[in-house]
């Protein structure tokens, strides 16, 4: 991946203990909130700027990405608001916990250096939502600079501007419309955690493979002969941080396992392997065409297994709860894949990706997320 000046890249120590999927899960928590909040933010900006033409969007527009292949965070603002002919950047933060002693803000978001002086960033506002109290605040970087202390944030392992609780919470305003917004965020984070637990389940099932002696040089060369072997080998290589030889060929071969009658469990194995291989290679046009087509086919097959109670079912031998986990895991990866292809390949292959719809909200491909959420909650209590 080509490096760019607007990205702060993670140190290897930040992500080496996590697989790529685990890193993306962590990145997706804030992304869920960001894409859910856009409509609400637009309404708030309209209140601030009445009788103005307002347009609000994520940085990058339809091509925005909630994770980077090599780790790290972008320097781009979270949102851009076009207010008539003026553009204002918005940085978004939210608190999930009560009784915080400090509210922390990254230095690079608050100030910039000019003529060796530190000055507050212009043309930018902060939007902060305090979920426990259903309150929010909109303020300028200059307010942070005036009210914050400069100190170490252990969780970030870096220095930041820290606004004491007693000062910050005076800014917060109640808003009853935050109730539904925060509920939607909580539901999607619940689904995120539920589907991702499939990784831990598979680690437990396949732990015996990690305990045996593995010839790493041999395992990266041989193309597996069936889907189950494909999944096991990709899972091992992913956790060993190894890349197979001829990974492009592996991907094409893997896509041949996709058919209309495939079970949800096997779909989850396929999308895991696709995701693992895809992140390690550069696709040629014919491979991209196949992947776009097969991704669409997989999503349609998953949707066909949706039930009226919010579950997904394709088998009589696997519990509906576990089948639903497989379905949600697959939807999660396929949405990532769709957005990644748009982000990285639409410039060079616009014709191939012209019919691919960008992901507007995370988990938008779950037919009725409220029903699915309630089904999972009931199933987890049994």
Label each region the model flagged.
Residues 188, 220-245, 259-289, 313-340, ...:
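An alpha-helical repeat/solenoid feature that recognizes helix-turn-helix modules
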Residues 1-196:
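Nucleic-acid endonuclease domains
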Residues 83, 130, 215, 259, ...:
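Acidic surface patches and DE-rich sequence motifs
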Residues 39-42, 234, 303, 377:
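Class I S-adenosyl-L-methionine
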Residues 195-198, 202, 206-210, 250-255, ...:
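Buried hydrophobic core positions in alpha-solenoid tandem helical repeats
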Residues 255-260, 300-313:
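HEAT/HEAT-like alpha-solenoid repeats
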Residues 244-252, 286-297, 340-347:
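Short sequence/structural elements of tandem HEAT/ARM alpha-solenoid repeats
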Residues 87, 134-137, 218-220, 310-312:
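Hydrophobic residues embedded in beta-strands of well-ordered beta-sheets
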């Amino acid at each position: 991946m080509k490096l760019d000046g607007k990205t702060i890249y993670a140190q290897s120590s930040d992500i080496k203990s996590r697989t790529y999927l685990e890193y993306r899960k962590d990145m997706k928590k804030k992304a869920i909130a960001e894409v859910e909040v856009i409509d609400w933010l637009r309404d708030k900006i309209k209140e601030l700027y009445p009788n103005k033409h307002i347009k609000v969007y994520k940085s990058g527009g339809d091509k925005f990405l909630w994770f980077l292949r090599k780790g790290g965070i972008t320097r781009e603002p979270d949102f851009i608001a076009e207010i008539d002919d003026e553009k204002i950047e918005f940085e978004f933060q939210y608190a999930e916990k009560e009784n915080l002693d400090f509210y922390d803000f990254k230095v690079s978001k608050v100030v910039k250096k000019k003529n060796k002086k530190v000055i507050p960033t212009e043309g930018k506002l902060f939007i902060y939502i305090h979920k426990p109290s259903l309150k929010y605040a909109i303020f300028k970087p200059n307010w942070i600079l005036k009210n914050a202390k400069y100190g170490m944030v252990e969780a970030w392992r870096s220095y930041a501007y820290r606004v004491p609780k007693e000062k910050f919470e005076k800014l917060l305003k109640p808003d009853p419309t935050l109730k539904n917004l925060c509920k939607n965020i909580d539901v999607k984070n619940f689904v995120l955690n539920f589907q991702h637990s499939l990784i831990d389940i598979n680690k437990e099932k396949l732990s015996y493979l990690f305990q045996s002696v593995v010839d790493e040089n041999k395992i990266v060369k041989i193309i597996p002969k069936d889907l189950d072997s494909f999944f096991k080998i990709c899972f091992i290589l992913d956790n060993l941080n190894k890349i197979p030889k001829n990974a492009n060929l592996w991907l094409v071969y893997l896509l041949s396992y996709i058919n209309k009658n495939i079970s949800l469990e096997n779909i989850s194995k396929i999308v895991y392997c696709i995701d693992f291989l895809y992140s390690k290679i550069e696709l040629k046009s014919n491979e991209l065409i196949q992947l776009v087509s097969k991704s669409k086919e997989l999503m349609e097959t998953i949707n066909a297994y949706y039930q009226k109670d919010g579950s997904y079912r394709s088998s009589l031998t696997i519990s509906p709860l576990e089948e639903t986990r497989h379905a949600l895991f697959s939807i999660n990866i396929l949405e990532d894949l769709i957005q990644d292809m748009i982000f990285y390949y639409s410039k060079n292959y616009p014709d191939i990706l012209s019919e691919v719809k960008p992901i507007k909200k995370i988990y938008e491909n779950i037919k009725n997320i409220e029903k699915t959420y309630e089904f999972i909650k009931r199933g987890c209590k049994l």
